[in-house]
């Protein structure tokens, strides 16, 4: 018997966007902690970006993130942690 597909929704009041509205790894870390309540260290986010595990676009020396990409990454992260 197949498992039913679970649709994950962001927390109340958190809007997701495909636009690259978050500038920098520190801002991505802050969004993940403040908006989603994830217990992450900044170095974990930096390592995930460096390994290409966290979706981002690099322009010059700065990484840009979308809230939808961060939310989808957080779902994968929470499966590993929980």
What are these regions (language model features)?
Residues 33-64:
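Major-groove DNA-recognition helix of helix-turn-helix-type DNA-binding domains
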Residues 68-82:
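A short, Lys/Arg-enriched interface patch at domain edges and termini
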Residues 29, 46, 71-72:
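Generic structural signal for individual residues within well-ordered alpha-helical segments
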Residues 2-9, 80:
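Arg/Lys-rich, low-complexity, intrinsically disordered N-terminal tails that contact nucleic acids
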Residues 1, 21-23, 57:
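Generic N-terminal leader/processing signal
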Residues 24, 64-66:
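Intrinsically disordered, low-complexity regions enriched in Ser/Pro/Gly/Gln/His and often acidic
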Residues 7-42, 76:
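Polyanion-binding surface elements
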């Amino acid at each position: 018997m197949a498992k039913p597909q679970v649709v994950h929704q962001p927390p109340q009041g958190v809007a997701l966007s495909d636009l690259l509205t978050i500038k920098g790894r520190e801002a991505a870390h802050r969004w993940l902690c403040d908006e989603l309540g994830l217990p992450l260290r900044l170095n974990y986010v930096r390592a995930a970006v460096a390994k290409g595990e966290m979706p981002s676009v690099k322009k010059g020396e700065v990484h840009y993130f979308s809230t939808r990409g961060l939310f989808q990454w957080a779902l994968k992260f929470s499966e590993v942690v929980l």
